[in-house]
Every structure is written in structure tokens, then in C-alpha cells.
Amino acid sequence: MKELIPYFPALLMDFCLGIVITNTAYFSTSLSLSATFIGVLMSFSTLLFTLFAIPFGKLSDRIGRSRLLSAGCFLITLVSLGLPQCQKGWHLVMVYPWVGLSQALFWPTYEAWLAERQGRGTLIQRLRLFNLFWCSGITLGPVMSSYLQRSPNPDFPFYLVSGCAVLNWLLISRQSELTSADLHSTSDHVLDPANDRPTHRPTLFIYISRIANFASWFTLSILRSLTPKLATEKMGVAPTEYGHFIMLMGSVQLLIYIWYGSKRSARWHYKLPPLFFPQAVTAMSLFTLGWFYHPQLWMIAFALFGISTATTYFSSMFYGLVGNTSKGAQAGWHEAILGIGVLLGPLIGGWLADLSNNPQSPYLLCGGLMSSLLVVQVGIWLTMRNSNKTDQPAQ
């Protein structure tokens, strides 16, 4: 149990983030705000995250991890206490964007810190535990927020966030600074010293996986930030039903992360089909979301998207960290590219939903984007697979 304690900050922070995003979407309905407004609001927050993820990741390489982790927890505490006090749209504009800065302080730093920690497992096994914990948090947060909409005080989830953030800070503050004895060798083995990692493919797969992860998080940001408002306000979907969709998607993600942390998954590393086919099936399911609303079809689509998102996220993070000495910088690039998707998704999706007066139009956008980027990924594969350029380290 003691070895699992370092993973709990990921669960708590994403639990907080999931509640803040979902509850803000529900909260916006009481303020009569449009989908475009919410999209811009979420995107502005993500812009701060995207701009600062790489600098903060590099800064953590120089000054240590725990200071930035504590600052991220402190900032999300202040934001969660300020959001219930907002009475107008411009109040939200003043408060909500700080969520993005708190996440930029936390995630690149935490991912690098975790990748360095000495433990019984290899890098891939530690990534499995990390993914299980953060995915549990980001799944339970929206579900909790959705169910608490029935309570007499729908602002209660915001106060729950402040308590969890303080708990997270206390947990992190008890973790001592890493010493040189605690650090892994920079040549992290994937599974064992005999691992057969293709020397000509690392950069190729970093590029492909980051593009794929961009598409996944573009879509995921719409499902998390716009769907609670659009589905409940314009499609008659109950908040608890939305919570069920998120719970299913998160549960599937957890199962996929368990698979990628196993020895059997090694045969899938540095191969295109395991990364390509989940995206292709998901793109088709997104068109289904855009054309129909039927609870069973949506359950299937959310489950398929859980498979694709887990695959692209694991791939982007794994290919960037394995065997790389600048883990803070690599985690920063991983988070920044992911963040661009989260920035653009609500911004474009909210605008499109209002322009077309169709709450399902953002899903058609996501299906088209993912299909287009699949073509780009195949093009990169065909161009670089036999090129010496793939021997060079990616930024």
C-alpha cells in the first residue's frame, strides 16, 4: 500500500478537475450562458495550460518538483472557492481560467516526478498505475458532480474540490525530495534488459502518437465540457445518464491501461495497427453520436472512445518518456500538445453548436477531425518509417 501513495495525487487532482469542469458546465445553465461562451471560457483556461506546461516542466527539472506541485494544489483550491460566488458571465471569466494554470503547474511536474521514482516496477508498470489512478479520478469527478445536481445545494461539489485539493497538498508535502539513490537510470527498460526496442522508430512513433492524442483530447474536451450542458439542456438527457456514459468510458479506459501495463502489450509497441485501428473505429462511432441519440448507441460509442483515448494517451506518454533524460521537458510537450486539443475542442465545438443550432454537430466535427488526422498519421508513417531522421530524438 505504501508504494501506491505517490499515485494518489493524480487521482485527487483529476477528481478535482473533473468536478470543476462538469459542475461549471451545469452551473452555466443557471446563468443562461451559451455553448459558445462556455467553449471560449474552457479554451481560455486551456490556453494558459498550453502556454505554461512546457516552461513549468522545464522549471521543475531545475528547481525540483514539490514546489510546483504544491502551488498547483493551492491554486485549484482558490478557484474552487471562487466559482460558487460567480453571479455573471464575466465573473466566470475572471475566475475559471486559473484552472488551466493550476494544471500546468501540476501535471508535467508530477509526470516527470513519477517517472523518476524508484520502485519495484519498470517505467511501463509505473505508467500503468499512474494511468489507473488519474483515470479513476477524472471518471469519478464528473459522475459525482452529475449525481450531486440532485442535492439541495448544487454548488457543493465546488467545496468538495477545495477539501480534496488541500488533502492533496498535505499528501504531496509529506513526500520527501528525491535523492540520487531514488532515481532511475536514464536508460529506463520497458520490461527487461533484453527488451528489443527498434532503434529507428522512436521519433516516428512520438510524432504519430502525439497527433493521435491531440485528436483524442480535442474530442474528450467536448464530451466533458460541452456535453453536460448541450445534452441536458437541449437533448433532454438527465445528468445521471450523462454520468453513466462517463463512468462506462472511464471503466473501459482503466481496463485498457491495465492491458498496456502488462508484459503481453510489449508486442504492440512501435507498431502502427494497434494505434491506428482504435482511432478508425472511434471516428465512425463519433459520426453515430452526431446523427442519432439512442442511449445504447451512445454507450457503445463512449466505450469505443475509451479504448482509443487510453491507447493514444499511453502511447504519447510512453514513447516520450522511455529512455529520455529530459523527462520534465518531454512531459511538458506531451501535456502541451494534449492541451492544444483541449483548447480548440470546446472553442470550435461550442461555436458550431450555436451556429448550427444542433447540439450534436460537435460530434460530427470530431469524427471528421479524427478521420483526417488518421490520414496524416499514415502519411507520416509512409514517409519516415525507413528514414534516418527517425533516429534523432524528438522534442
Regions found by a protein language model. Give the residues of each.
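Helix-loop boundary and gating motifs at the non-cytosolic
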Residues: 1-46, 206-208, 212, 217-235, ...
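Helix-to-loop junctions at the C-terminal end of transmembrane segments
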Residues: 53-64, 149, 256-270, 353-354
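Structural signature of the two symmetry-related core transmembrane helices
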Residues: 67-81, 272-287
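Cytoplasmic helix-loop-helix junction between adjacent transmembrane helices
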Residues: 97-132
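Intracellular juxtamembrane helix-capping segments at the cytosolic ends
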Residues: 105-118, 310-324
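Symmetry-related core transmembrane helices of the 12-TM Major Facilitator Superfamily/SLC fold
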Residues: 156-173, 363-378
